[in-house]
Amino acid sequence: MIGHIQGVLTSKQPPEVVLDVQGIGYEIQLPMTCFYQLPPVGETIKLITHFVVREDAQLLYGFISASERSLFRLLLKTQGVGPKLALAILSGMSADEFVMAVNQNDVTRLVKLPGVGKKTAERLVIEMRDRLKDWQPSTPFTDRAPLDSQGMDAREHPADARTDAISALQSLGYKENQAEKALQKVYSAEHNSETLIRLALKQLS
């Protein structure tokens, strides 16, 4: 079990990052709500991790705080929810927003998430309500606020930002036409890919 990883952030390709730890690059997938809080490439960061072993792959999922990882693991206990869907859920809304949606029986909000139909949303509300009774948010390793386009790599080309945003949204479960439609509403050449993804997810949710 790999509980956390600390290393130099060498690549950011939403929703995946690469951390260099003594010459070894670890590919880690993050919910976009965590991705927004990352520092620029080249800085050292520490991520709480969840390790998944499958027959065809070994995957690492990363989080800013232990409570986010705990919520991810609770989601995995729900019937029909695997790591990909859990990642999409926590990309579409913050941990606090998800907990609020469950506590308020807000099925309408949940079905807007990619891969979540009405039955899955109802199951999430029923199965997660009791599990979340003792859930408490914890302090993340970094107190960085979500970074805007000024805090990211200014060298990113607008066309690349749009392409990366579409790719990231598709990896989270949205169809290409859904991603395109959402990006049309928020696109600006001044936005980098992370800002575009954040704004598009607001449109989609």
Swiss-Prot record:
Known function: The RuvA-RuvB-RuvC complex processes Holliday junction (HJ) DNA during genetic recombination and DNA repair, while the RuvA-RuvB complex plays an important role in the rescue of blocked DNA replication forks via replication fork reversal (RFR). RuvA specifically binds to HJ cruciform DNA, conferring on it an open structure. The RuvB hexamer acts as an ATP-dependent pump, pulling dsDNA into and through the RuvAB complex. HJ branch migration allows RuvC to scan DNA until it finds its consensus sequence, where it cleaves and resolves the cruciform DNA.
Record's keyword terms, sorted = Cytoplasm, DNA damage, DNA recombination, DNA repair, DNA-binding
Gene name, per UniProt, is: ruvA
Q: Which superkingdom does the taxonomy of this entry point to?
A: Bacteria
Q: According to its UniProt record, which protein family does this protein belong to?
A: Belongs to the RuvA family.
* Subunit and partners: Homotetramer. Forms an RuvA(8)-RuvB(12)-Holliday junction (HJ) complex. HJ DNA is sandwiched between 2 RuvA tetramers; dsDNA enters through RuvA and exits via RuvB. An RuvB hexamer assembles on each DNA strand where it exits the tetramer. Each RuvB hexamer is contacted by two RuvA subunits (via domain III) on 2 adjacent RuvB subunits; this complex drives branch migration. In the full resolvosome a probable DNA-RuvA(4)-RuvB(12)-RuvC(2) complex forms which resolves the HJ.
Q: Where is this region: Domain I?
A: 1-64
| UniProt region (Domain III), positions on chain | 157-205
Report residue spans for region: Flexible linker.
144-156
Q: Which InterPro entries match?
A: DNA_helicase_Holl-junc_RuvA_I (IPR013849), Hlx-hairpin-Hlx_DNA-bd_motif (IPR003583), NA-bd_OB-fold (IPR012340), RuvA (IPR000085), RuvA_2-like (IPR010994), RuvA_C (IPR011114), RuvA_C_sf (IPR036267)
Which segments carry the region annotation Domain II? 65-143
What is the native source organism of this protein?
Idiomarina loihiensis (strain ATCC BAA-735 / DSM 15497 / L2-TR)
Q: Name one GO cellular component term.
A: Holliday junction resolvase complex
Picking any one GO biological process from the record gives: DNA repair
Note down the stretches annotated as region Disordered: 136-157
Principal location class: cytoplasm
What does the entry note on its domains? Has three domains with a flexible linker between the domains II and III and assumes an 'L' shape. Domain III is highly mobile and contacts RuvB.
Record localization: Cytoplasm
Under which name does UniProt file this protein? Answer: Holliday junction branch migration complex subunit RuvA
Look up keyword Cytoplasm and say if it applies. Answer: yes
